[in-house]
């Protein structure tokens, strides 16, 4: 096993070296970075050319420059990273430029990847369990459509209809009666298709979901919820109950009375602690408070499960602990919506509630309120995350469906059914785990594809992150060069001397006459 892991690690390093070499050489040969200066009539053009050639070692072939840069990368292992400098950014170190952009890109990519995996696998499993149903055909058609869509087109459509048109709707949020009816019927059809079973069961599912969704939308419209949204303790209770129902259904089933009792106690404790948590969130106004509350509620859930779990205390504790940890989501949403009025007053009127430009609002970033900043980040991340998620979601749906169908036809699944195990136990405990093995193999590839899509998405939504940095570097056609440690001091002197000779200086990436 150790030999196998070693071989894989060595192969990974070799792949990284070859890939970085190819990208570096392609970038270096994408164009002449001195082309504008060569045709310039500026009297200092030749001095500027000499300066840039000395700073970036343009007098050396790209292969030698690559190994010079690779030496700076290798120094990262001893804590002396040197990825070179970016002349386009006023000789800013590349490591600083990447550090400022990497956080926003990872935030966006991780959110899109996690949501795509969770939602895609859930939809894929339900379509596999309802094979050849109307629901299966509709989802199959939609996934093929989504998988074929170009990312830039999806991003532009979301920007138009998900932000511009939706912000116009929020100016006068009135929902026509026919829209409520159509949405209710569609949701009822989806619910009846997922539930399946006999005709009577389908009709009950269709009617209950359609009436519930239609009534909820009508209530939100009448109470003008879209003008001043809020959750409150009632919303926290409903979201917590929905989360608990999903977890119990997939984990133990509602027939497990001890699990239902333990989860019920956790829900009651969450609602009982809602008011004290208001003071905690007010005085501990920090993102770490979310982690603290999640750990606290998960610990309470595990403790309750161990107390009331009986012989199956491990399963009950796991279920109750998971429900307890997830209760932090409605609590955080409640805190964010409490800042809605302040958020609306601080954002520029031209931006709208659903933002289409940048990763945050500068006026809100300066406010020392973690919940307000979370709300601002959520409105800015919503559309880019959906744009990145929708294509990956289609892929995960298809893979999950095919994998689960293959596993469900295996002999050990038939044996489990023959022994009298329930369908939920067969699917969740035996089939689901093995069906996830092929999914795990494509996550790394999909993560790289999402990063590639982020380059385009960030440009559409004007995010100053890795995508915009990549575009900027490609357009400038300037490859950074790492420097040996003993050459840095001499290089600084050379840059000062070249500036003095040229009679100009670099200011924010622009040449200024002395």
What are these regions (language model features)?
Residues 9, 13-25, 106, 110, ...:
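Generic alpha-helical transmembrane segments of integral inner-membrane proteins
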Residues 59-121:
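An internal, D/E-rich "acidic patch" concept
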Residues 15-64, 172-178, 338-372:
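Hydrophobic alpha-helical transmembrane segments of membrane transport/permease proteins
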Residues 133-170, 174-179, 189-202:
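Alpha-helical transmembrane anchor segments
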Residues 8, 25, 29-37, 121-125, ...:
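Membrane-spanning helices that line or support transport/gating and their immediate boundary helices
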Residues 483-493, 497-506, 513-514:
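C-terminal transmembrane helix and the adjacent membrane-cytosol boundary/short C-terminal tail
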Residues 2, 111-125, 184-479, 483-484:
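Alpha-helical transmembrane segments of integral membrane proteins
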Residues 44-77, 461-473:
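Short hydrophobic, aromatic-rich alpha-helical segments embedded in or entering the lipid bilayer
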